[in-house]
């Protein structure tokens, strides 16, 4: 009879401990989720920045560099060296990379 009483008492204590622990963890998660939503709800524009300046495109030199980088990656995937990258034409060598 004593063992049943002790077992039930321990079961109640353990279950109440886990219930408090679960509630605390869920409150922390809810708080962090709500903070996360408020952080990413929309970026506030600075008064010193003109919104028209935010979406400036790439210059032609930047576009050539980006194209040549993509060309180099393409050649490397084929296990070839890059022969040349001019006027939006990508050429890889015939020899394999050693």
UniProtKB/Swiss-Prot annotation:
Protein family (similarity comment): Belongs to the DEFL family.
This protein's UniProt keywords: Antimicrobial, Disulfide bond, Fungicide, Plant defense, Secreted, Signal
Transmembrane segments: none
GO biological process terms, semicolon-separated: defense response to fungus; killing of cells of another organism
CC per GO annotation: extracellular region
Disulfide bonds: 68-85, 71-90, 75-92
Signal peptide range: 1-16
Organism whose genome encodes this protein: Arabidopsis thaliana (Mouse-ear cress)
The protein's name: Defensin-like protein 219
Organism superkingdom: Eukaryota
């Amino acid at each position: 009879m004593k063992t049943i009483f002790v077992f039930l008492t321990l079961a109640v204590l353990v279950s109440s401990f886990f219930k408090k622990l679960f509630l605390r963890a869920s409150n922390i998660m809810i708080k962090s989720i709500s903070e996360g939503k408020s952080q990413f709800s929309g970026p506030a524009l600075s008064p010193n920045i003109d919104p028209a300046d935010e979406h400036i495109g790439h210059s032609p030199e930047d576009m050539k560099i980006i194209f040549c980088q993509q060309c180099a990656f393409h050649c490397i995937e084929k296990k070839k060296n890059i022969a040349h990258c001019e006027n939006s034409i990508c050429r890889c060598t015939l020899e394999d990379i050693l």
